[in-house]
């Protein structure tokens, strides 16, 4: 079927392809479908009040956490989980089946062909991509560009979806979106209307925002979640070695939530991270810095990108860790129109 217009008169994003809509409907099962399996509608409402809107999301919770929901006994939880299992395939599958499932992955262009090539096509859905580096290394500029490119149709290497942006440092600028949208030939106001934004002030606020996001993602076609930066509030709210263990535990819980969102709704999760001094880096290493967050963040992020400054407005991206990408570097440039290929 031929693609339809991307935006309605009201500026809201329209899904471009009818076949794509059918694919998206198969990505997750609504929690309301439990009613057809004999679950009381009141119990389904309790799950929704707790931030659980899909059967996929339900199966990502332990029974212990589900019994913590007011009004749900162990017997009810067992019955609910049994009903959800009937709607989903949660067991082993073959590698061939997984390969077919991986075809649902969408790769969103960064705006730079060189960077896209390095990333195997762009920022992937179904996983967390972390970008770390010093200030002015291009992390937030890449985030702004992705806010626009995500809304491009699939055939233009976009995500054909909306964007959720959690800002912990107050660096998001809507006026920055305007020239980037113009570069891609898109209506700036319509693009901004399809970005939902929240400013987080504590790590608890940051986590609660993620819980509330599930309701929106279950109802609307989101394709990207940005957290800029993921570690900033944890470094402020927890200080000293005495609170390090608790900080890492809370950070792990939040990263687990991000992973579940990525897999539950087939969205790309792009997080930025700060760097800290690495006194044990060695005497032959000139740049003694490493990403903050320790092993907890290192294991949670599927793809880790190290950004650094180059000449002038040029930036260099290096694959720091990725399960499916070879080591390599790409040079890109920060312009008024966002991230682009570097000019010699």
UniProtKB/Swiss-Prot annotation:
Binding positions (ssDNA): 235, 238, 241, 247, 315
Any one GO CC term of the record: condensed nuclear chromosome
Residue sites binding ATP per the record: 133-140
Keywords, comma-separated and alphabetical: ATP-binding, Cell cycle, DNA-binding, Meiosis, Nucleotide-binding, Nucleus
Binding site for dsDNA: 235, 241, 247
Single Gene Ontology MF annotation: DNA strand exchange activity
Other noteworthy facts: Plant silencing DMC1A are sterile due to defects in homologous pairing and subsequent chromosome segregation during male meiosis.
Function per UniProt: Recombinase that may participate in meiotic recombination, specifically in homologous strand assimilation, which is required for the resolution of meiotic double-strand breaks. Exhibits DNA-dependent ATPase activity when bound to single-stranded DNA (ssDNA). Mediates renaturation of homologous complementary strands as well as assimilation of single strands into homologous supercoiled duplexes leading to D-loop formation. Binds circular single-stranded DNA (ssDNA) and circular double-stranded DNA (dsDNA) in vitro. Catalyzes DNA homologous renaturation and DNA strand exchange.
Protein name in the entry: Meiotic recombination protein DMC1 homolog A
């Amino acid at each position: 079927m031929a693609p339809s217009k991307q935006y309605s008169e009201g500026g809201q994003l329209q899904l471009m392809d009818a076949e794509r809509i059918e694919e998206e409907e198969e990505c997750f099962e609504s929690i309301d479908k439990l009613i057809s399996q004999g679950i009381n509608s009141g119990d389904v409402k309790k799950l929704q009040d707790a931030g659980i809107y899909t059967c996929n999301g339900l199966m990502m919770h332990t029974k212990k956490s589900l019994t913590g929901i007011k009004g749900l006994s162990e017997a009810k939880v067992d019955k609910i989980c049994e009903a959800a299992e009937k709607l989903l395939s949660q067991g082993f599958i073959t590698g061939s089946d997984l390969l077919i499932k991986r075809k649902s992955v969408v790769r969103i262009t960064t705006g730079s062909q060189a960077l896209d090539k390095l990333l195997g096509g762009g920022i992937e859905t179904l996983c967390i991509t972390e970008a770390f580096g010093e200030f002015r290394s291009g992390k937030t500029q890449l985030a702004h560009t992705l806010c626009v490119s995500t809304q491009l149709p699939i055939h233009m290497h976009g995500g054909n979806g909306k964007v959720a942006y959690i800002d912990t440092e107050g660096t998001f600028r809507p006026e920055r979106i305007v020239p980037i949208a113009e570069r891609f030939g898109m209506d700036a106001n319509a693009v901004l209307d399809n970005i939902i934004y929240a400013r987080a002030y504590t790590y608890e606020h940051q986590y609660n925002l993620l819980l509330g996001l599930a309701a929106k993602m279950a109802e609307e076609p989101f394709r990207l979640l940005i957290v800029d930066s993921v570690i900033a509030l944890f470094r402020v709210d927890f200080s000293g070695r005495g609170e390090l263990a608790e900080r890492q535990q809370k950070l792990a819980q939040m990263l687990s939530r991000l992973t579940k969102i990525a897999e539950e709704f087939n969205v790309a999760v792009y997080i930025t991270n700060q760097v800290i001094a690495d006194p044990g880096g060695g005497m032959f290493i000139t740049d003694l810095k490493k990403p903050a967050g320790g092993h907890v963040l290192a294991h949670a992020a599927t793809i880790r990108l190290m950004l650094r400054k180059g000449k002038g407005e040029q930036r260099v991206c290096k694959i720091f860790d990725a399960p499916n990408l070879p080591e390599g570097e790409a040079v890109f440039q920060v312009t008024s129109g966002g991230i682009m290929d570097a000019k010699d």
